[in-house]
């Protein structure tokens, strides 16, 4: 299962958008999805501030095009489109951390699509304290590890400077008859 054929064949429309010039097919567990030629995409919709972490295209380009297509056409629900996206990222060999970051971002986008301001505020009231709650232990543990590393490095330097090297063994004395 996975994508059928080679990579996507696209033409640039402008600085952000591209158009498929050949169909892109994905064989799922039960269904086959085909993105038609002429479909307009921006590849991975990554905010500009995060492009250094996740570029707009890469090993996940076909998965991003498929996800754009499934969300725009409504062929499957948003949750299913996000699940297919995650599965296709796995099949494309995208690393686990990047795969989960990308999946979490599209899930968040799907959940916030059409959300009322009250819903977004409720989500922020949970998310912001959670980040702060997690940031404090991360900073403390990182600082402790840095102190430990510095102490260990100090002992290593002292040991390296004061080490004693044994005298080289004597050369063998060869006698011939």
Tell me what each language-model feature is.
Residues 1-177:
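Extended terminal accessory/targeting regions
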């Amino acid at each position: 299962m996975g994508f059928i054929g080679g990579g996507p064949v696209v033409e640039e429309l402008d600085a952000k958008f591209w158009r498929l010039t050949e169909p892109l097919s994905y064989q799922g567990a039960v269904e086959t999805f085909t993105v038609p030629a002429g479909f307009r995409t921006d590849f991975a919709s990554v905010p500009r501030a995060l492009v250094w972490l996740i570029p707009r295209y890469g090993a996940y380009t076909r998965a991003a095009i498929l996800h754009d297509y499934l969300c725009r056409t409504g062929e499957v629900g948003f949750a299913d489109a996000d699940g297919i996206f995650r599965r296709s990222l796995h099949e494309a060999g995208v690393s686990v951390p990047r795969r989960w970051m990308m999946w979490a971002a599209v899930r968040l986008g799907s959940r916030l699509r059409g959300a009322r301001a009250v819903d977004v505020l409720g989500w922020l009231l949970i998310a912001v304290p959670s980040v702060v709650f997690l940031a404090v232990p991360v900073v403390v543990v990182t600082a402790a590890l840095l102190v430990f590393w510095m102490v260990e490095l100090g002992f290593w330097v002292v040991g390296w400077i004061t080490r004693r090297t044994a005298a080289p063994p004597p050369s063998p004395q060869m006698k011939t008859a």
